[in-house]
């Protein structure tokens, strides 16, 4: 470890391309310039805060500065200096952005606690809180939310805490146990634990890159926002407010294939299309892979990823790429177990089979179920969903909901174009006739939309 602390600035500089190193040097010259514009060779915390301005919260600026200042320079005469030298600046950025897990872990450790003595889990938790808050802050400040507007002016604290808890849940202690909550906060964290955490939780490194690239306006060309936040395609004249915020979108996107991360197309929303199961079916069928999200009346947010187009039929569909997830009150994903192939189910208008949308489990006992009698559903898991090993996702096993969204992922492939202009009742005459025979009202009649190519 000691060698990592004493690596020379020249060696660290070699990790950057020549044009990148020139940009790093230019930023250092700006930070280290006195009021007269003369470079002093070092810079202070105040100079860094003055440069960053409102782009990052002050707490994160201090953490970045502490991380730089604690890099041991090769010139030992600078070791007790309270300012940051060019060598320290370059070494910190090089190791944080381009270093190995060991080197990144060391820089993170330097940022976590500036005080002497052992680092405890509560220190890591506070660092993670500052990191998550800084990412949400800087993306908002730089206008890089890519269309994801919050229902409030900023990302809700509950969402930040859910993301923090999710990141910490992957931290392993020396006894092999993972972080379990407040009872772990006084446990000591060593360098090896932080290195392993950084390695197993890619979001830590990615979030730090966002803070540097967008907070310091450094090496911006090496960061593509679309790899982190998909573009929100929901052009409704500003009327639409998603259940999701930017942090939950980042979390979900990270579990998708690259081709599904670039843009998300709003297919259905109760806010825009009303409480209608036939409207839901007509908007989500033949649309390719999709993500459905619900918020029950108790505030729990959850849903599932459908790996292929939804089709109305009494058989299960989909494949083992499907998964269930929860967003609030905690973030988690639940992958297939291999126990069965009950990945996706969508049926309507039949008397002998369940009518509704389901994922996982079995008929009448789904891991996630939205009834055709819209606004009702269930999430049954005693002890867990057989298909996805998911717990109960909703607050109550049988739940009510008013908010639901379905997002098409990526571009709509040609094979699906032309299939999505008909009502589900038009394309499924059997469902239509059975609905009429049963005497049930056709709530969607008269509510048909203009075909998409005529908008």
Short names for language-model regions:
Residues 78:
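Generic anion/oxyanion-binding catalytic loop in active/binding sites
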Residues 101-108:
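A short alpha-helix capping/helix-loop junction motif
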Residues 1-5:
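Polybasic, Ser/Thr-rich amphipathic helices
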